[in-house]
Amino acid sequence: MELATTGKVNEVLFMNRGEGESSYAQNSSFTQQVASMATLALENAVETLFSKDFHLQALNATDLGCAAGPNTFAVISTIKRMMEKKCRELNCQTLELQVYLNDLFGNDFNTLFKGLSSEVIGNKCEEVPCYVMGVPGSFHGRLFPRNSLHLVHSSYSVHWLTQAPKGLTNREGLALNKGKIYISKTSPPIVREAYLSQFHEDFTMFLNARSQEVVPNGCMVLILRGRQSSDPSDMQSCFTWELLAIAIAELVSQGLIDEDKLDTFNIPCYFPSLEEVKDIVERDGSFTIDHMEGFELDSLQMQENDKWVRGENFTKVVRAFTEPIISNQFGHEIMDKLYDKFTHIVVSDLEAKLPKTTSIILVLSKIDG
């Protein structure tokens, strides 16, 4: 199945389900580390909402692309804690919190809600009662009524595309990104242009939908994978996909995967630069940028000395968020071989040190009027 349409991507884009060794629930420590870097931004966003004359009785918040790991629980806890702090300061008596957890229909909502505990949401007798609902669907379209949201949070989700970029075959139907699954140094310029164009289209749709749902002066805190370089083929931004493509190509050479399946597969994901994100937000015109920054984190658990353990841990993280979409293209039966090959490639690259991962924090306010 080629990922050429939004419907097909929506069917296979989700994190590994359950709570097993390869599940996202057990391998989300890196995204948890990323999200923790944005905790202050989220706290400030809640503080800002209370400084505006909303006359709040209930704060409506959503976590878009919440997946099924513990990270979304930390988001709920942070919002609730800040609301309780403001309630004590302002002597509020009736404030409530409504949180909507959103992801695509294939998301493991069962594991997600099984993990919700009284420690996360508290009880209804507390000073800020918390109510949680699931909202399945694509955040590239409308999910909520007009002017219904005060706060939008999303971590490591907005960089996923609605489909593989259009125009990656020539007039004869031959692949233009042969042997690769993302932008690389050998990709022709049209591949880079197609990826940026698709991200521009999708992020604009995201902003347009939120502009209708978020109340005037409401806030959005977005964390997405990005890059520091202006070059989208820079190894810092594409090394995961580059190493996966090498692993897939080795299985092609062994006759375990058809070469055509590799040549026709392009991952529906784009890691933008800060300048590209800023340009799209300003062109859309619905939100002002209150804060934007990029930061780097080690891609591996550097405290682990054994390079094989580090390589295996990195593979588990990558497998947790790539296996559903990769197995859809290449087959479930070769996944163990593929990720074992990936581990060997990662370990061999450790000698040259894998690049750090760049993330972007973006805080937006809905323009009033």
From Swiss-Prot:
GO biological process per UniProt: methylation
Site entry: Involved in substrate discrimination: 153, 225, 269, 317, 332
Alphabetized GO MF terms: caffeine synthase activity; metal ion binding
List of residues binding Mg(2+): 177, 263, 265-266
Methyltransferase among keywords: yes
EC number(s) from the headed UniProt entry: 2.1.1.160
Cofactor binding mode and count: Binds 1 Mg(2+) ion per subunit.
Name of the protein this chain belongs to: Caffeine synthase 1
Organism lineage: Eukaryota, Viridiplantae, Streptophyta, Embryophyta, Tracheophyta
Function of the protein: Involved in the biosynthesis of caffeine. Catalyzes the conversion of 7-methylxanthine (7mX) to theobromine and of theobromine to caffeine.
Xref: InterPro entries: MeTrfase_7 (IPR005299), MeTrfase_capping (IPR042086), SAM-dependent_MTases_sf (IPR029063)
Catalysed reaction equations from the record: theobromine + S-adenosyl-L-methionine = caffeine + S-adenosyl-L-homocysteine + H(+); 7-methylxanthine + S-adenosyl-L-methionine = theobromine + S-adenosyl-L-homocysteine + H(+)
